UniProtKB/Swiss-Prot annotation:
Species this chain originates from: Gallus gallus
Domain U-box: 1-73
InterPro entries, alphabetized: G-protein_beta_WD-40_rep, Pre-mRNA_splic_Prp19_cc, Prp19, RING-Ubox_PRP19, Ubox_domain, WD40/YVTN_repeat-like_dom_sf, WD40_repeat_CS, WD40_repeat_dom_sf
Keyword check for Methyltransferase: no
The protein's role, per its UniProt record: Ubiquitin-protein ligase which is mainly involved pre-mRNA splicing and DNA repair. Required for pre-mRNA splicing as component of the spliceosome. Core component of the PRP19C/Prp19 complex/NTC/Nineteen complex which is part of the spliceosome and participates in its assembly, its remodeling and is required for its activity.
E.C. number: 2.3.2.27
Keyword list, A-Z: Cytoplasm, Cytoskeleton, DNA damage, DNA repair, Lipid droplet, mRNA processing, mRNA splicing, Nucleus, Repeat, Spliceosome, Transferase, Ubl conjugation pathway, WD repeat
Pathway per the UniProt entry: Protein modification; protein ubiquitination
Gene this chain is encoded by: PRPF19
Classification via PANTHER family: PRE-MRNA-PROCESSING FACTOR 19
GO BP terms, alphabetized: DNA repair; mRNA splicing, via spliceosome; protein K63-linked ubiquitination
Subcellular location: Nucleus; Nucleus, Nucleoplasm; Cytoplasm, Cytoskeleton, Spindle; Cytoplasm
Major localization listed first in the record, in broad terms: nucleus
Protein name as annotated: Pre-mRNA-processing factor 19
Any single Gene Ontology cellular-component annotation: cytoplasm
Length: 505
């Protein structure tokens, strides 16, 4: 039954009831009446707006007026209904399109979140594995304190939270001197004779039967081999460091990867083979030097000698100590057995980052390259800078001592290689290369007969005449490492194209 307003006798849009008379009114009309009279219109009893009680009913559908009974009126009513339906349909389509876009955006966000979660899970797993590797060595990583008496050597107050230095004891100082005496005696016995087994250069050719691409090592998604070294006792064993943060030991004779060593958190820029033990060494911009066991494919020692990127690495002739350089301006001398940093030195007068470091074959002196184009020669015993070789322009990229003990080759970002006589402390030859030629690696063969350089391409020079005899352009990217096999029977090179190539003289 429909409610009827007692005032208008029509169906009210907003019905309410008066508790005074129990009659139903249209709220709009009864409020006006109360405002004028203040009483109920039926029994004239006092009544206020607050006393009115709303009645909740379904929205009333008013009957069509008599005019809707004609055909034109019906057609107009149908047209109005059609317009209303179309407008409602259009609104629904707009809402549907908006909902679809929101759903698509939400799905993309969900997919991205899943990818991030997967990546973080992988990183956490890798970090846990690295932590498990480090835990057994935790007691050896931080050196014990032994005060240093040298004013320019980083001591307890200058250790930069890397631990105090173990110090250079008399026994440690004596060991390199004894080794140098033996090596000098052996060099004198050999004299200037060239080994009979040494290969003579006949012309540039690749090792027979090998594809020009040779072996692709390291990750294809993060391409680039940044460091190369050959085992001195077995040059068939190749050591490489890559942009993928890994170190790989490769056997040339079996064409097999012997070990993949993972642990660095950044790219590997320097690698060194131990001549007599199954150990290899690697350095990285993550400010660590890692010592690896090849048979176990595991890290046995982490040396934290620097605060900045480690830029150079060289093993002492005794096989017991490592020399490292860093862009924190220090070079460090560390014990590989204990992981202790024995001493750290910086040239306070220059205050410049070091770019590379290399021991002299005798091990009593060594050289470092700097960002300001200087080559500095250091005395290991006194830990003092004994000579400087200026002349380059641009950061020093590589240095190499000849096995004869007299020659030093240096390269910089000036497209030149300079040869220095260590007896006279002067530059006696400059190999001027093509403009924009980059040199990333220098090395003499074991006899001191050949000099190889790698960079824009690979070039081989014969010493004394200092003329180019071979030129290889096989790498599709920059050559980052070059090395000689035993008696120069082959040449190995690595590059940013992640390939390892071998050539014969």
């Amino acid at each position: 039954m429909a409610l009827i307003c007692s005032i208008s006798n029509e169906v009210p849009e907003h019905p309410c009831v008066s508790p005074v008379s129990n009659h139903v009114y249209e709220r709009r009309l009864i409020e006006k009446y109360i405002a004028e009279n203040g009483t109920d219109p039926v029994n004239n009893q006092p009544l206020s707006e607050e006393q009115l009680i709303d009645i909740k009913v379904a929205h009333p559908i008013r009957p069509r007026p008599p005019s809707a009974t004609s055909i034109p009126a019906i057609l107009k009513a149908l047209q109005d209904e059609w317009d209303a339906v179309m407008l409602h349909s259009f609104t629904l389509r707009q809402q549907l399109q908006t909902t679809r876009q929101e759903l698509s955006h939400a799905l993309y966000q969900h997919d991205a979140a899943c990818r991030v979660i997967a990546r973080l899970t992988k990183e956490v797993t890798a970090a846990r594995e690295a932590l498990a590797t480090l835990k057994p060595q935790a007691g050896l990583i931080v050196p014990q304190a032994v005060p240093s008496s040298q004013p320019n050597v980083a001591g307890a107050g200058e250790s930069m939270d890397l631990g105090e230095l173990a110090g250079m004891t008399p026994e440690i100082i004596q060991k390199p001197q004894d080794k140098a005496t033996v090596l000098t005696t052996e060099r004198k016995k050999r004299g200037k004779t060239v080994p009979e087994e040494l290969v003579e250069a006949r012309g540039a050719q690749q090792v027979p039967g090998r594809s020009p691409r040779m072996w692709g090592l390291h990750s294809a998604s993060i391409p680039g081999i940044l460091a190369l070294d050959l085992c001195p006792s077995d040059t068939n064993k190749i050591l490489t460091g890559g942009a993928d943060k890994n170190v790989i030991v490769f056997d040339k004779s079996s064409e097999q990867i012997l070990a993949t060593l993972k642990g660095h958190s950044k790219k590997v820029t320097s690698v060194v083979f131990h001549p007599s033990q199954d150990l290899v060494f690697s350095a990285s911009p993550d400010a660590t030097i890692r010592i690896w066991s090849v048979p176990n494919a595991s890290c046995v020692q982490v040396v934290r000698a620097h605060e900045g990127s480690v830029t150079g690495l060289s093993l002492h002739a005794t096989g017991d100590y490592l020399l490292s350089s860093s862009d924190d301006q220090y070079w460090a001398f560390s014990d590989i057995q204990t992981g202790r940093v024995l001493t750290k030195v910086t040239d306070e007068s220059s205050g410049c980052a070091l770019t590379c470091a290399q021991f002299h074959p005798d091990g009593l002196i060594f050289g470092t390259g700097t960002m300001d184009s200087q080559i500095k020669i250091w005395d290991l015993k006194e830990r003092t800078n004994v000579a400087n070789f200026p002349g380059h322009s641009g950061p020093i990229t590589s240095i190499a001592f000849s096995e004869n003990g007299y020659y030093l080759a240096t390269a910089a970002d000036d497209s030149s290689v300079k040869l220095w006589d260590l007896r006279k402390l002067k530059n006696f030859k400059t190999l001027q290369l093509d403009n924009n030629f980059e040199v990333k690696s220098l090395i003499f063969d074991q006899s001191g007969t050949y000099l190889a350089l790698g960079g824009t391409d690979v070039q081989i020079y014969i010493c004394k005449q200092w003329t180019e005899i071979l030129h290889f352009t096989e790498h599709s990217g920059l050559t980052t490492g070059v090395a000689f096999g035993h008696h120069a029977k082959f040449i190995a090179s690595t590059g940013m194209d992640r390939s390892l190539k071998f050539y014969s003289l």
